[in-house]
């Protein structure tokens, strides 16, 4: 199959199942992180993955084509966002879709107890079409050169820390109508006064409809009803291969230790809620309690 600049590689059937939660990714030489990312999102409850690969030569394609729940497309263009939008509009309509980078792990309030399909069912119930997230850079409490990751192991076992503060929110006129700044990258770029802070807000979880488009990465999208709850993307760029991902934009080297006064070790979603980095609401909390109670066997 050829669609725009995407050519289908695998020949697996794609079932017509509207209940599937589908993830969409772009890959290029991502074998170091790929299995860890796929495992995390499978455990959340993602049913099927659609991947646009930009010509990987490090074994990424072999891993993708060997996975029975992954559909692989060769991307021949330079615009990864256009490829994602093409895939989403071909295979996403009617589904809850999760669009992430291979270096990102999606988390949301109560993700430890509430599987992603049930969380999406809750969002449907309250009339939401999407959920926004903050991107949190994860790093080790040791020099960057020591953050050697073993493929397939949990990424948090290699990089378990993030900046707990400061983060700032500003309003904008593009959906989701706000942007978040701060965190580690702002710290590395000279602080909030330097004017170099990258945008950390994303809209990765969307109930896709025909004609929707991501506009500037996954940070902006054509207008949708954004949920009053918020999640996070744990971002694992700062492994020992950091130069391939962010070495050009940041003044860091193998001896740099990113651990600082604002660093905390990731624990769970409750911690992120307490820090004000993600958000829950009472109706979601009550839904989780009911779901948990229904699973608990009654004593005789």
Model-derived segments and spans:
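N-proximal low-complexity "stem/linker" segments adjacent to membrane-targeting elements
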Residues: 1-35, 39
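Glycine-rich, basic loop-to-helix element that forms the pyrophosphate-binding segment
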Residues: 37, 78-89
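A conserved acidic beta->alpha catalytic loop
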Residues: 53-66
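Conserved donor nucleotide-binding strand/loop of the catalytic core
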Residues: 65-82, 167-168
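The conserved acidic donor/metal-binding loop of glycosyltransferases
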Residues: 101-106
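Catalytic-site signature of metal-activated, phosphate-bearing donor transferases
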Residues: 110-300
């Amino acid at each position: 199959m050829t669609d725009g600049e995407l050519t289908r590689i695998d020949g697996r059937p794609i079932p017509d199942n509207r209940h599937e939660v589908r993830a969409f990714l772009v890959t290029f030489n991502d074998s170091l992180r790929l299995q860890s990312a796929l495992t995390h999102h499978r455990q959340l409850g993602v049913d099927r993955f659609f991947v646009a690969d930009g010509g990987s030569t490090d074994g990424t394609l072999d891993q993708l084509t060997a996975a029975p729940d992954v559909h692989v497309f060769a991307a021949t263009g330079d615009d990864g966002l256009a490829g994602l939008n093409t895939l989403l509009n071909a295979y996403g309509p009617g589904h809850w879709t999760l669009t992430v980078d291979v270096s990102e792990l999606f988390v949301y309030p109560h993700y430890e107890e509430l599987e992603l399909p049930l969380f999406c069912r809750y969002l449907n119930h309250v009339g939401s079409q999407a959920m926004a997230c903050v991107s949190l850079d994860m790093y080790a409490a040791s020099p960057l050169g020591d953050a050697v990751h073993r493929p397939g192991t949990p990424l948090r076992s290699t990089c378990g820390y993030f900046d707990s503060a400061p983060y700032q929110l500003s309003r904008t006129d593009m959906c989701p109508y706000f942007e978040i700044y701060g965190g580690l990258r702002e710290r590395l770029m000279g602080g909030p006064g330097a004017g170099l802070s990258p945008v950390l807000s994303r809209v990765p979880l969307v109930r896709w409809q025909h004609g929707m488009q991501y506009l500037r990465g996954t940070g902006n999208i054509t207008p949708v009803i954004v949920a009053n709850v918020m999640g996070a993307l744990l971002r694992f760029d700062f492994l020992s291969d950091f130069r391939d991902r962010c070495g050009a934009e940041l003044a860091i080297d193998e001896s740099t230790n990113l651990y600082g006064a604002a660093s905390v070790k990731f624990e769970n979603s409750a911690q992120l809620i307490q820090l004000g980095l993600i958000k829950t609401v009472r109706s979601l909390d009550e839904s989780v309690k009911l779901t948990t109670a229904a699973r608990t066997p009654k004593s005789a």
